[in-house]
Structure formats: C-alpha cells, structure tokens
Amino acid sequence: MNTDIKTRSFKFVFWIMLILLSGDTIDTIYRFIVIGYLGEGTTFPGVDSIIKPNTIDLFIFLIFQIGIFYGIYLLYKLKKIGGYWFLGSNFIFLIYASILGPIAEIGILNILLPIILYFCLYIILSICIPWFYSDKFN
C-alpha cells in the first residue's frame, strides 16, 4: 500500500519540485538583475537592507545561474546529481556574495535566518525528494 501511494504521488511531487525550484530561480534573476542591478537596488526577502550589485557581481551571478539551471535540467531528466548542481551553485554564489559581493556590504549575519530557511527548502526539494524517490532517479 505504501509503495502504491509513493508511486502515484511521484508525478505530482516531481512537478511541484520543478515548479518551485524554477520559480524561485526566475524570481531571483528578476530581483538581482532588474530590480537590483538595473534599478535602485533590491532587498533580500525578509530583510530591509538594500543590495546593489555591480557589473562583476552580475557577471559572476550569471555564471552561477547557468549551473543552477543545469541542475534543474538534470533533475528534470531524473538525475540525482542535478540537486547537487543546484544546491552547490547556490551555496558557492552565497559564499562569493557574502565575502566579495553585494552581501558583504550589509553583512551575512543580517540575513542569516532567511538564508537558512531558503537552504532548508532547497535541501528538501533538490536532495530529499530525489533521494525519497530513488527508484525513479538515477
């Protein structure tokens, strides 16, 4: 009975996972480029500090977004490694942004709680779901 529910729920959970990861990535791109780089600066969700990236930040951001989209593509192709690409690209960009990038200006401790919440959600969506449905993912 448990396997039957697991099998039937896979398609729904799979598409919700892809929609949430893709939607968050598209929102991040919009907030970083349109509002942050081209506009007056963006705020991190849940925090009032304004982040204004420069051209180098934008270039590095776009490189890591390629890795994030590649991870989502691999998840779409049912490859577990896609979750690691997604999570790794996000984490490495976070390290860059907090040391040399736009987050360094406001300090990572000011946005630590939202970052922890986002990464917990990312781990559930990109690592735990492929692990739970390991019979479907390679």
Describe the role of every protein-language-model region.
Residues 1-138:
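Topology signature of small-to-medium multi-pass alpha-helical membrane proteins
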